[in-house]
Amino acid sequence: MRLILLGAPGAGKGTQANFIKEKFGIPQISTGDMLRAAVKAGTPLGLEAKRFMDAGELVTDELIINLVKERLQQPDCANGYLFDGFPRTIPQAEAMKQAGVPIDYVLEIDVPFDEIILRMSGRRSHAASGRTYHVKFNPPKVEGVDDMTGEPLIQRDDDKEETVKKRLEVYEAQTKPLIEYYNTWAKNGDSSTPLTAPQYRRISGLGSVDEIRDRAFEALK
């Protein structure tokens, strides 16, 4: 099972990624984790990445793809792998294809933006303990106050409505085009690569966590 998980921030990809990893016995490939591990290990690619990072520059797509290829050689990828958060852009997707990274499924978790804004902007947390609440779905017993300590709850900057909207705008511009890219490849194939086209699946990300999990498993049969 070689899989790319797509969906907007707040669509619940992380939660579903955990279910998929467990069911199929595959690792989740995180480019951030890979970069940190390569830099720490001092591998040639890691040293190259460190030069970019120390200069405050973005690591090039070419270097990230080489790190991905190196990571996929590890024994835990023998049964497949799951990409969540990569590729983010069409050039990255194209580079993956040209590098011969095989993908069986692209699974999109589809949630309307107004629902995502409601989900994320309603989160509240207790800073000291990390306990989280939601003003609509999981409210504290007393509004704005932690159940255990009676201390005030905060809204993280990441969860403020204007921040959520900005993140969704970036997603709309950079990552959403991947949906059309993979959909087109799945439907029409691509003679420029020997890779088999992936199957494209879209599921609704509305409902309970278990309902969405069942939809995901059904889509990946």
Swiss-Prot record:
Monomer. One of its GO terms (biological process) is AMP salvage. AMP binds at T31, R36, E57, L58, V59, G85, F86, P87, R88, Q92, R156, R167. Consists of three domains, a large central CORE domain and two small peripheral domains, NMPbind and LID, which undergo movements during catalysis. The LID domain closes over the site of phosphoryl transfer upon ATP binding. Assembling and dissambling the active center during each catalytic cycle provides an effective means to prevent ATP hydrolysis. Keywords: ATP-binding, Cytoplasm, Kinase, Nucleotide biosynthesis, Nucleotide-binding, Transferase. It catalyses: AMP + ATP = 2 ADP. Residues 122-159 are annotated as: LID. Catalyzes the reversible transfer of the terminal phosphate group between ATP and AMP. Plays an important role in cellular energy homeostasis and in adenine nucleotide metabolism. GO terms for molecular function: adenylate kinase activity; ATP binding. Pathway: Purine metabolism; AMP biosynthesis via salvage pathway; AMP from ADP: step 1/1. It comes from Paraburkholderia phytofirmans (strain DSM 17436 / LMG 22146 / PsJN). Belongs to the adenylate kinase family. ATP binds at G10, A11, G12, K13, G14, T15, R123, T132, Y133, G207. It is an enzyme of class 2 (transferase). It is found in: Cytoplasm. Residues 30-59 are annotated as: NMP. CDD domains: ADK (cd01428). It comes from the Bacteria. Its EC number is 2.7.4.3. One of its GO terms (cellular component) is cytoplasm. InterPro entries: Adenyl_kin_sub, Adenylat/UMP-CMP_kin, Adenylat_kinase_CS, Adenylate_kinase_lid-dom, P-loop_NTPase. The keyword Nucleotide-binding applies. Its main location: cytoplasm. This is Adenylate kinase.
